[in-house]
């Protein structure tokens, strides 16, 4: 998943694409863009300056799509089509939820349709039989944080159960405390696109 961030005012009309967590070792920059390349010469970030001249973009965070890829190819001569419409935010169902002794944390087994993930969660409202939004490994939150495999108190965690705040959702469509609680109109395994 590519993290796509844009705000005409606060980011000085610059589109920021976070392609990977690799550190750039080479930079290619001109008046239109700045590209970062990792040790394997793969693009790890792209910044496009004066982005508003390529269209009307009113969101701050969005899913990488064909339109953005065409702009990238035109401006930077880089093809990122393999990332188009990859969404690492999916609907999951908590099948098991056990408290981790002496902590506020829970170890959850979450069905995301094609697999069951172990996820450690600190939300008070985490419980068995709840449908939730799962940020899988590789997801990038609107804050820019990339979700990686982690370990808490020796317990491996393969994703994150998300709150509306963490996803930048402020429209009161979802509960504002704890992780998002979804009803059955959101099928398990389907993409969650409410923040794009």
Residues covered by each model-derived region:
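Phosphate-backbone binding interfaces of nucleic-acid-interacting proteins
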Residues: 1-196
